[in-house]
Swiss-Prot record:
NADP(+) binds at residues 520-521, 526-530, 562. The keyword Repeat does not apply. FMN binds at residues 69-74, 116-119, 152-161. This is Sulfite reductase [NADPH] flavoprotein alpha-component. It catalyses: hydrogen sulfide + 3 NADP(+) + 3 H2O = sulfite + 3 NADPH + 4 H(+). GO terms for cellular component: cytosol. FAD binds at residues 323, 357, 387-390, 405-407, 411, 420-423, 600. Binds 1 FAD per subunit. One of its GO terms (biological process) is hydrogen sulfide biosynthetic process. It comes from Photorhabdus laumondii subsp. laumondii (strain DSM 15139 / CIP 105565 / TT01) (Photorhabdus luminescens subsp. laumondii). Residues 235-449 form the FAD-binding FR-type domain.
């Protein structure tokens, strides 16, 4: 049903909150809406934002807890810690890093940061503004602050947990005192996180005495996502059906990009443009057989994974990573195999990291043969983790479907074809109507403007175009009046113009106001989206002055950095600013949610 909102000035909610709410209840019946109104009224009256016991003694110190999350893990851990602290009758306010007013940091007495790392050791996207502020000349001394940091990362990357390390070091440099040493968590972090939570809660309970009658407060920042969340999660995914897997690059393309449609049926799974889809996958049985043969194992041996007993073959297919090597795995395997070449790498961290990056697990075993026990080998490997893909559809148009735009990872090692774990699973091994286990990873840091009249600039080369297809479907469904400008790039026009017909229709219909295309291999000199941005610098600056929101999606290591440099150059040149002023201006756009990135 369609609901016409009253004047924003009369509402106790922001325009952004109203739009998010409307997107969630758009298909609710009048009966359901009436029930919801009573539900929310009851929630407000039964669960007030400040839970009070009879106030008596002076208010205790409040703990400020900041989650800097990239894929939701830091946020979930922060919520677990908040519950621990509340159970001990401690005051705690939980903030997403993007919502934290960082200039109030000088007033913080107890500061806890849980920080994910993305790309090449960079902070999570929502934490960039806070990170830059802490390293700026404006940041005050924090001599009256105590703090603790938990870092989340992945040992397959060279700068493991670098963002957590940076936050920890910088707070200490500013005069803050550690409550306990920083802890770094790998992909399978829950056990060390549980220990850290228990230790930190004990320290804080001793530091902050509580008495009967103390008023206990907690920021209740329930989002629309939480209110309307379904029962499907990473741990309990939805089993949906693969409806379509269609190659959308040409025969002559060096890239294999798939348009994937998944049927949600009557599951009730909900998502918004900007969200990601988590996909659980299985390893290629042929790869599993190759590994078993190289190790002289049968696959029928019994092993234990997370307390569950199963065959080695089943464990290798469904429970552990086989396509992502890490320096930790190389080091452990070197000791197990007693291989001199691998053992020599251990002393050279950079060489070890490079070897792990370039040599898949199967090829490492081929180079350094060994005959371990089945359980020994399983214990070397990391648990299988789902892959996240930017959603390329809007439920306003696709209803009970979710679409993905997936680049299939294909390469060769010494003449042997290798394929990405999840992308190969989707493209090569699943058939139409096959079951696929999925869940939604909400991303409130990549959302369309609340005001449909706001201009939008979308920058997404390659499969980075995915969320912008969802954006345009949503803007069309909403009848949004705001202008839309797309910057897209790929190697060749004839082979790699993803969703060409759809973009041409949007241009023809007037929904897509402008489109700039960068084909890097169609001429002698390479042209990328950042070059097109600079070429249109004056117009881009005009749109920014008109209030445009900027969105970037795609490769974090090169493209996103090059695009940011181009934006800084545009702001400096056309805004009449020096380098420092341009950087502050872009940081302000980020803080205002006018510059958002979904990079990986």
């Amino acid at each position: 049903m369609s609901i016409k909102p009253p004047s924003i000035s009369l509402l106790p909610v922001s325009p952004e909150q109203l739009v998010r709410l409307q997107s969630e209840i758009g298909d609710f019946s009048p009966t359901q809406l009436a029930w919801l109104s009573g539900y929310f009224w009851g929630m407000v009256n039964q669960q007030p934002q400040v839970q009070a016991v009879v106030p008596a003694v002076p208010a205790q110190e409040t703990i400020t807890l900041i989650s800097a999350s990239q894929t939701g893990n830091a946020r979930r851990l922060a919520e677990q810690l908040r519950e621990d602290l509340l159970a001990q009758k401690l005051n705690v306010n939980l903030f997403n890093a993007g919502d934290y007013k960082f200039k109030q940091i000088a007033q913080e007495k107890i500061l806890i940061i849980i920080a994910s790392t993305q790309g090449e050791g960079e902070p999570a996207e929502e934490a960039v503004a806070l990170y830059k502020y802490l390293y700026s000349k404006k940041v005050p001394k924090l001599n009256d602050t105590v703090f603790a940091v938990f870092g989340l990362g992945d040992t397959s990357y060279e700068r493991f947990c670098q963002a957590g390390k940076d936050f920890d070091n910088r707070l200490n440099e500013l005069g803050a005192q550690r409550l306990l040493e920083r802890v770094d968590g790998d992909v399978e972090y829950q056990q060390v996180a549980d220990q850290w939570r228990k230790q930190l809660t004990g320290i804080l309970k001793q530091r902050i005495p509580t008495e009967t009658g103390t008023e206990i407060t907690s920021a209740q920042d329930r989002s629309v996502n939480e209110v309307f969340s379904t029962s499907y999660t990473k741990q309990a995914p939805l089993t949906a059906a693969l409806a379509t897997c269609q190659k959308i690059t040409g025969r002559g393309s060096d890239k294999d990009v798939r348009h994937i449609e998944i049927d949600l049926g009557d599951s009730g799974l909900r998502y918004q443009p900007g969200d990601a889809l988590g996909v659980w996958f299985e390893n290629d049985p042929e790869l599993v057989d190759e590994v078993l043969n190289l190790l002289w194992l049968q696959g029928t041996e019994q092993v234990e994974v997370n307390g569950q007993k199963l065959s080695l073959r089943e464990a290798l297919i469904s429970h552990v990573e086989l396509t992502q090597n890490t320096s930790v795995i190389v080091e452990k395997y070197a000791v197990l195999a007693k291989d001199e070449k691998l053992l020599s790498l251990i002393a050279d961290k950079q060489a070890l990291q490079q070897y792990a990056h370039n040599k898949p697990i199967a090829d490492m075993i081929r180079e350094a043969a060994s005959q371990p026990e089945a359980q020994q080998f399983i214990d070397l490997l990391r648990p299988l983790t789902p892959r996240l893909y930017s959603i390329s559809s809007s439920q306003a148009e696709m209803e009970n479907e979710v679409h993905l735009t997936v680049g299939v990872v294909r390469y060769e090692i010494d003449g042997r074809a290798r394929t990405g774990g999840a992308s190969g699973y989707l493209a090569d091994r699943l058939q139409e109507n096959s079951d696929i286990r999925i869940f939604i990873e909400h991303n409130d840091n990549f959302r369309l403007p609340a005001d449909p009249r706001t201009p939008v600039i979308m920058i997404g080369p390659g499969t980075g175009i995915a969320p912008f297809r969802a954006f345009m479907q949503q803007r069309e469904a909403d009848g949004a009046e705001g202008k839309n400008w797309l910057f897209f790039g790929n190697p060749h026009f004839t082979e790699d113009f993803l969703y060409q017909v759809e973009w041409q229709r949007y241009v023809k219909d007037g929904l897509l106001t402008r489109i700039d295309l960068a084909w890097s291999r169609d001429q002698q000199h390479k042209i990328y989206v950042q070059d097109k941005l600079r070429e249109q610098g004056e117009a881009v600056w005009c749109w920014i002055k008109e209030g445009a929101h900027l969105y970037v999606c795609g490769d974090a290591n090169r493209m996103a950095k090059d695009v940011e440099h181009a934006l800084l150059d545009i702001i400096a040149e056309h805004g009449g600013m020096d380098t420092e002023q341009a950087d502050e201006f872009l940081s302000e756009l980020r803080f205002e949610r006018r510059y958002q990135r979904d990079v990986y």
